[in-house]
UniProtKB/Swiss-Prot annotation:
Residues carrying the site annotation Discriminates between blocked and unblocked aminoacyl-tRNA: 10
EC assignment: 3.1.1.29
Main location: cytoplasm
Source organism of the structure: Borrelia hermsii (strain HS1 / DAH)
Annotated GO MF terms: peptidyl-tRNA hydrolase activity; tRNA binding
Origin superkingdom: Bacteria
Catalytic activity: an N-acyl-L-alpha-aminoacyl-tRNA + H2O = an N-acyl-L-amino acid + a tRNA + H(+)
Record keywords, A-Z: Cytoplasm, Hydrolase, RNA-binding, tRNA-binding
UniProt-listed Gene3D superfamilies: Peptidyl-tRNA hydrolase
Name assigned to this protein: Peptidyl-tRNA hydrolase
Length: 188
């Protein structure tokens, strides 16, 4: 099964290492780990390569989080992919820091990036990889997700990226449930 991995985040160096940008940073980690580079097209960056006899396309939307869905008509047309190939990597404030959750389908909850994608696709039937960024009652949700990780938090998230970089490229229909068990039982 070919895989279209879309990491959500906000473009610009001021968002680097923020909780909302874990999707971007996982894509960056995959690019570096596999000796790739990102190419820019209109409103997204991508890398297209083969891994274990399947096509992998990595995407970083450059539309800002709340408009992430805007890229999908051109992405699906350019790469000849379908919703069945899609895995969206996104932050989740309902999961503890470092906890991950892989799902085949799901809702949008309070996540505007997922809401934008679901509206654009007309469906919520696409894969999601949630990365727990913790929660905080001291600030608003917006302030919290746009805040940078601190010291030991950043080290934990980097460990998550290393682990996920080993796990997600191998996802396919035959091992999806095994990958769910492996990823969902991990914690950093």
């Amino acid at each position: 099964m070919d895989l279209l991995i879309v990491g959500l985040g906000n473009p610009g160096s001021n968002f680097f290492h923020t909780r909302h940008n874990v999707g971007f940073e996982l894509v960056d980690n995959l690019v570096i780990k596999n000796g790739l580079s990102l190419k820019k097209v209109k409103n997204y960056e991508y890398s297209d390569f083969n891994f274990e006899n399947k096509r992998i396309v990595l995407i970083k939307p450059l539309t800002y989080m709340n408009l992430s869905g805007n890229i999908f008509p051109s992405v699906f047309a350019k790469f000849y992919m379908k919703i069945a190939n899609l895995l969206v990597v996104v932050d989740n404030v309902d999961l503890p820091l470092g906890k991950c959750k892989l799902r085949k389908v799901g809702g949008t909850s309070t996540h505007n990036g997922l809401r934008s994608i679901s509206l654009s696709l007309g469906s919520t039937n696409y894969g999601r990889l949630y990365i727990g960024v913790g929660s905080n009652n001291e600030s608003s949700l917006r302030e919290f997700v746009l805040a940078k990780f601190r010291g030991s938090e950043l080290e934990r998230i980097k460990s998550v990226f290393e682990f996920l970089s080993e796990e997600i490229l191998g996802i396919d229909e035959s091992n999806f449930e095994h990958k769910v068990a492996t990823i969902n039982s991990s914690s950093f």
